[in-house]
From Swiss-Prot:
E.C. number: 7.3.2.2
Source organism of the structure: Thiobacillus denitrificans (strain ATCC 25259 / T1)
GO molecular function, one term: ATP binding
Entry function: Part of the ABC transporter complex PhnCDE involved in phosphonates import. Responsible for energy coupling to the transport system.
Subcellular location: Cell inner membrane
Entry protein name: Phosphonates import ATP-binding protein PhnC
Catalytic reactions on record: phosphonate(out) + ATP + H2O = phosphonate(in) + ADP + phosphate + H(+)
GO cellular component, as recorded: plasma membrane
Gene name tied to this protein: phnC
Record InterPro entries: AAA+_ATPase, ABC_transporter-like_ATP-bd, ABC_transporter-like_CS, ABC_transpr_PhnC, MetN_ABC_transporter-like, P-loop_NTPase
Length: 259
């Protein structure tokens, strides 16, 4: 069964820029998919459509069989957790309070506004922190953590939501290589253990090849590759990193180093 269905989707912004051009794809439940491509390829726009942060100009996006639109957006977003490049934590709050914000979609409007959580929520938050190895940091301020630790808090917040899908937008772009490896391994473990569908935007080819079940390569708003890591050849990478008929030499050289 498809966790995510994208049918004939285009996205055109008011300035006329067409970020996505006729995207058709299905992402299977419980799979780990990496969307790979250079900056400006449309990767982030695609993820934002999956969570209703953007709306398609044409076409439809469905999560768990439900169309992502304004009518049931809160309900759909409760199924879809986001992990962000810049962590999106409230730095002055404690780690556990940041994780608890993952429960807001399960609370009433009043509870969301006033950060009213139940004892059950606190238990879920503590369990999520244990999963990411940060139990001892629960009452520390978020801004006292390292970048890798802050991203672990972001993942714990996603887990606390009890989602069916986790969307991670360049989750390791600002991390060192060791932390990047640890974060990708953690997302992979969550996918395997919990059966949560994970979609990750990356530009690191080596990480994509090591952790993904499937790689979707994008260039200039189109899907130009769709296959397994073993099928990601040097020629496929050239197609992904070609820019308006000219190869993006810096990105391509880095990509080919891991082909």
């Amino acid at each position: 069964m498809s966790a995510i269905s994208i049918q004939s989707v285009t996205k055109r912004f008011p300035n006329g820029f067409e970020a996505l051009k006729g995207i058709d794809t299905e992402i299977q439940t419980g799979s780990f998919t990496v969307v790979l491509g250079p900056s400006g390829a449309g990767k982030s726009t695609l993820l934002r459509l999956m969570n209703g942060l953007e709306t398609p100009t044409t076409g439809a996006v469905r999560i768990d069989g439900e169309t992502v639109d304004g009518h049931r957006l809160r309900h759909i977003r409760s199924k879809v957790a986001m992990v962000f490049q810049q962590f999106n934590l409230v730095e002055r709050l404690s780690v556990v309070t940041n994780v608890l914000t993952g429960r807001l979609a399960q609370r009433s409007w009043v509870g969301s506004v006033f950060y009213l959580f139940r004892q059950e929520d606190l238990g879920i938050a503590r369990e999520a922190l244990a999963r990411v190895g940060l139990t001892d940091k629960a009452w520390s301020r978020a801004d006292k953590l390292s970048g890798g630790q802050q991203q672990r808090v972001g993942i714990a917040r996603a887990l606390a939501q009890r989602p069916k899908v986790i969307l991670a937008d360049e989750p390791v772009a600002s991390l060192d290589p060791v932390s990047s490896e640890e974060i990708m391994a953690l997302l992979r473990e969550i996918c395997d253990r919990d059966g949560i569908t994970v979609v990750v935007n990356l530009h690191q080819v080596d990480l994509a090849k090591r952790f993904a079940d499937r790689i979707i390569g994008m260039n200039a708003g189109r899907v130009v590759f769709d296959g397994t890591p073993a099928e990601l050849s040097a020629q496929a990478l050239r197609t992904i990193y070609q820019r308006e008929g000219i190869e993006d030499d810096t990105s391509l050289d880095l990509a080919l180093a891991y082909a």
